[in-house]
Every structure is written in C-alpha cells, then in structure tokens.
Amino acid sequence: MAIDVPEFIKNNAQRGLDYLADGFGGDGLTEGTKRAAREMAAGNISEDKVRKMAPWFARHKADGQAPQNKDSSDPGYPGAGLVAWLLWGGNANFDDAAQDWAQRQIDNLNNEKDRKSVV
C-alpha cells in the first residue's frame, strides 16, 4: 500500500535536514533516521517508518519543553530534540499532527491486513 506523505511532514523533514546540514542535531541521530528523513522530504515513506513514528513521538513529546527546543532566542536553539522531532516529520511546536497522521496510517495498514487475512 502506497502511503502519501503530507506536505507538512515533507517540509518538516526538510527543515530538520537543513538544520543538520548547518551543524545542529545531537550525537544520537542515526544514519537510518537521516536516510528516512531524506526519503520523507522527497515524499516517500516506508510502512516500517510509519509504524515507528507514533510511538516515537509519544516518547519524545516532553523534549519540546526544553528551552533549546522551543525558544528561538535560547542560545542552544535549535536543540537536538527539535532537530530530531523535525527529522521525524513533526511540527516545530511539538503538536500532535504528525503523530496523529502516523496513527491513522497505522490503523489503515492494520485494517488492510485484516481484510486480506479474511479473504
């Protein structure tokens, strides 16, 4: 099943990649995360990535409370948490839009698998 990546996720992933190119981001960023962000920015996403997104956002939501991740006047802005959030397709304000989108896709994927298993 092809998954259409919304513009806001494409744009956020690209913004995260731009920050990364400018030297921002933490040491914990994996090559897999960077590769997936490049794919999302280009409008492509794997089922595996979508399935990882909703739980990842749930685990990292609190990162948005750190000053370096939410206050553009903070000397540490943009913090590693913000850069990672963007690379995963999330909005800079740490809202639930990308998490909600990912959960809808997961639900759709699960429903499709259920339909196929009945046939």
Give residue spans per PLM region.
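Conserved small-residue motifs centered on glycine
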Residues: M1-R115
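Conserved small/polar residues in nucleotide/adenosyl-binding loops
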Residues: V118-V119
